[in-house]
Amino acid sequence: GALNDWWGNGVGSTPYAVKHYKEAVRLNRICDRLEEKTGVHNEELIQAYGDNSLLYAEHTWGHSATVTNPYDTMVTNLDMRKNSYASKAHEAAAMRKNEQCHKLGDILRYYNLSGKVKAVSTSHQKRVFPVEFYVETLSLSAVKVTDDKTKQEMEVQLSAHPRGVLISFLAEFEPMEEKTFTYEEQP
């Protein structure tokens, strides 16, 4: 089939790039809240995110040549450049989030079948949130997760993850609360 008319269809014609961009926006908002806890403010990454997210959101979708000549090099270059703005915004936001999480004690990689994980609420309201992390392993058939403070055993769900096993559960958090959970492989 023919290529989409990016000019005419706009945001709906590029769902993957838009999803990537919206994830960058979400990560940036999380980082704004995490900064309240860490006091760390990386102006360079904030500026990189801001510049690129603005360029992505403002830049038009395509060129009038997409209607008559969609395979033209200029059309392809404009499309690639526009998508790169979303990607660079996402990269800056992800780097900023990794920096914030590291300051809060996260190791960012989990290879052990038993250990501890910290979850941080970025909400100013008491709420129940999903907590998810993955363990890089070939198999993990069962796991026990316990809230270190209350000793409550959490109801967990295990699912496949591209790099191992994803562990998911729900936990109630006070505003901006940090919680530590212990996870242990079960036979």
Locations of the language-model features?
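Surface-exposed beta-strand/loop patches in extracellular or lumenal glycoproteins
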Residues: 120-141
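Solvent-exposed beta-strand/loop surfaces of large extracellular or lumenal domains
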Residues: 141-167
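Catalytic-domain carbohydrate-binding cleft regions of carbohydrate-active enzymes
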Residues: 1-107, 116, 148-152, 179
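Short, solvent-exposed loop/turn segments enriched in Ser/Thr/Gly
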Residues: 111-116, 127
